[in-house]
Amino acid sequence: MEIITQDGWLEVITGCMFSGKTEELVRRLRRAVIAKKETIAIKPALDTRYDLVAVVSHSGFSFNAIPVEDPKSILGMAKDAEVVGIDEAQFFTGELVPVIRELLQNKKRVIVAGLDLDFRGEPFGIMPTLLALADEVTKLHAICSVCGNIATKTQRLINGRPARYDDPTILVGGLETYEARCNLHHEVPGKTLTLFKE
C-alpha cells in the first residue's frame, strides 16, 4: 500500500544492505513529486559515499537531499514540505524520534529508510523505535552473496574477512566493505549467542 496523502503518516522502509531501501525511498519521493506534493529528502551528513547532496542507491537511483547533522534542524527545513524522506535513519541520534513525531503532528507524510540490524545482526540505533511507531513497514530482502538465497543480514568485511563483534558499529561503506548474507552464511566472530528467558 502506498499513501499519497499527507495526514501525519509514517512509512518505514527497512532491511539489510543491498535490499533496495534507498531505491524504494527514491521511488516513493518521485511519485510524491508527480502527485504535486512539496517534497524534500534528508540524509545524515556522515553519508558521503556517492553524493554530498543527494540520496543515492547502490544501483544509481538518486534524489536531491539536504545533508543534516542535527535532527532538530529538519523541522525548519520541512516547514513547507508535505512529504519528508529521510535516508539512512539508523545513523541519526535519538533526537530524530521527537522530530518525526512533530512532523507527523504537522500532518506531514514521513518516509524513512534505514537498516533494521547492524553488521552484528542486532537492532540498529533508533530503527526499532521507528519501526514500532510506523503506520506502514516495508521489509526488503537482498540476495545472499554466498549461496543466492534470501538475505536478511549485512555482513561487514575487513580485508575480505568477517568483522569481529567488537569492531565499531558504524563504518560507512558499500560493496568494498559489506555484503548481503542469509542467516546461514552471516558470520560475526566473537559473538556469543544469547538465549532469551521467558
Curated annotation (Swiss-Prot):
EC number(s) reported in the record? 2.7.1.21
Provide any one GO MF term from the record: ATP binding
Q: Which GO terms describe its biological process?
A: DNA biosynthetic process; thymidine metabolic process
Q: Which UniProt keywords apply?
A: ATP-binding, Cytoplasm, DNA synthesis, Kinase, Metal-binding, Nucleotide-binding, Transferase, Zinc
- Protein's cellular compartments: Cytoplasm
> Where, in this chain's numbering, is ATP bound?
15-22, 87-90
GO CC annotation: cytosol
Q: Which Pfam families match?
A: TK
Query: Where is it predominantly found?
Result: cytoplasm
* Keyword Transport attributed: no
Q: Which InterPro entries match?
A: P-loop_NTPase, Thymidine_kinase, Thymidine_kinase_CS
Task: Give binding positions for Zn(2+).
Answer: 144, 147, 182, 185
Under catalytic activity, the entry for this protein gives: thymidine + ATP = dTMP + ADP + H(+)
HAMAP family from the UniProt entry = Thymidine_kinase
Family assignment? Belongs to the thymidine kinase family.
Self-association and partners: Homotetramer.
- What name appears for this protein in its UniProt entry? Thymidine kinase
